[in-house]
Curated annotation (Swiss-Prot):
One annotated GO molecular function: magnesium ion binding
Regulation: Inhibited by tunicamycin.
Lineage of source species: Bacteria, Pseudomonadati, Pseudomonadota, Gammaproteobacteria, Enterobacterales
Topology term for the membrane: Multi-pass membrane protein
Name of the protein: Undecaprenyl-phosphate alpha-N-acetylglucosaminyl 1-phosphate transferase
Organism: Salmonella typhimurium (strain LT2 / SGSC1412 / ATCC 700720)
Pathway(s) where this gene product acts: Bacterial outer membrane biogenesis; LPS O-antigen biosynthesis; Bacterial outer membrane biogenesis; enterobacterial common antigen biosynthesis
CDD domains per UniProt: GT_WecA_like
Keyword Cell inner membrane annotated: yes
Coarse class of the protein's main subcellular location: membrane
Gene name of the encoded protein: wecA
Length: 367
């Protein structure tokens, strides 16, 4: 595929999604598909929840525009469409967690039975021995689908963060697949980014605060499902493009945040799905950073971790078990910082004050 052709297609997807999201936000306001501020949501005014619907429209446009060969494409679009519809209904009418979990489980079963996408192996994470899962892989796949959807749902807490973290994941997968010759799958990843960018621009208020939109559960569900579909497509089989352990690095921040916060809630005797303000973005902002700064810092951290995974995938000299050990070390470091968040926040504030004093004193020294 010519690079110029690929670029023109991505620009077309971006422009289509931009136009669609502006039209969709008007419809959303009329039908009540909006997010209203409450004790946890501190935004001003009602915000249309059309980011996810627009991303899905952009992806449908991409597949209608091109002739890429994507295995079981029709099945993916049907499954994703169902999840987006249920997510939109949840955004509008607040569907119970149990109903959403059942729908996600049914979609996962359909994916495993018809598309044959499931975890059959976790690779060589124990040295020279491949960890083959057998029938247990189907149960683990069900959990993986649920985990991916909820991981990206949980990081959708401040402006731009879900879009930034998902773009990092899709970019990492896209680069690996592009250089591996999997052009169609790589373009799918890049198309996801092109469809997400208009949402990021409106969500951050780059085109004006009055055009602000949110992703909604429809969007976070779509992103999580697409990520796990692509990872199952590319990490399994005899000639897989991505090692299973690399998948952990590609979605590191959403995965770490979900596991850490659910563990903390369970230890307190709370439901793992109960809302709170203990996510990574809340803790970073508590350390004295603004919402925009937290978005940049967390996205940068995700890019670094994904970069480690991509580099190891290309280097081929770092064993998979070493990458697993390094990931677990990174996870425990993350957990340590989260568990002692107040100490970390106090340390960061102290450093920021010290740097501020140094900047203030510097002009006096030069006089």
């Amino acid at each position: 595929m010519k690079l110029l052709t690929a670029l023109s297609e991505l620009i077309s997807i971006f422009l289509f999604t931009t136009i669609f999201i502006f039209l969709a936000r008007k419809v959303a306001i009329k039908i009540g598909l909006v997010d209203k501020p409450n004790f946890r949501k501190r935004h001003q005014g009602v915000i249309p929840l059309v980011g996810g619907i627009s991303v899905f429209a952009g992806i449908c446009f991409m597949f209608g525009l091109s002739d890429y060969y994507i295995p079981h494409l029709s099945l993916y679009l049907i499954c994703a469409g169902v999840l987006v519809f249920v997510g939109a209904m949840d955004d509008r009418f607040d569907i119970s967690v149990k109903i959403r979990a059942v729908v996600q489980a049914v979609i996962a079963v359909v994916m495993m039975v018809i598309a044959k996408l499931h975890l059959g192996s976790l690779g060589y994470i124990f040295g020279p021995w491949e960890l083959v899962l057998g029938p247990f892989g189907y149960f683990l796949t069900l959990f993986a689908v649920w985990a991916a959807i909820n991981a990206f749902n949980m990081v959708d807490g401040i402006d731009g963060l879900l879009g930034g973290l998902s773009s990092v994941s899709f970019a990492a997968m896209g680069l690996i697949l592009w250089f591996d010759g999997q052009t169609s799958l790589a373009m799918w990843c890049f198309a996801m980014i092109a469809a997400i960018l208009p949402y990021i621009m409106l969500n951050l208020g780059i085109l004006g605060r009055r055009y602000k939109v949110f992703m909604g559960d429809a969007g976070s569900t779509l992103i999580g499902f697409t990520v796990i579909w692509l990872l199952l497509e590319t990490t399994q089989g005899k000639t897989h493009s991505i090692s299973p352990v690399t998948a952990l690095w590609i979605i590191a921040i959403p995965l770490m945040d979900m596991v850490a916060i659910m563990y903390r809630r369970l230890r307190k005797g709370m439901s793992p799905f109960s809302p709170d303000r203990q996510h990574i973005h809340h803790l970073v902002m508590r350390a004295g950073f603004t919402s925009r700064q937290a978005f940049v810092l967390i996205t940068l951290a995700a890019a670094i971790l994904a970069g480690v995974g991509v580099t190891a995938e290309y280097s081929h000299f770092v064993p998979e078990w070493v990458m697993l050990v390094l990931f677990l070390l990174a996870f425990f470091l993350y957990g340590y910082c989260i568990k002692r968040a107040w100490k970390v926040a106090r340390f960061i504030k102290r450093v920021k004050r010290r740097l501020r004093r140094q900047r203030e004193n510097r002009p006096n020294l030069t006089k």
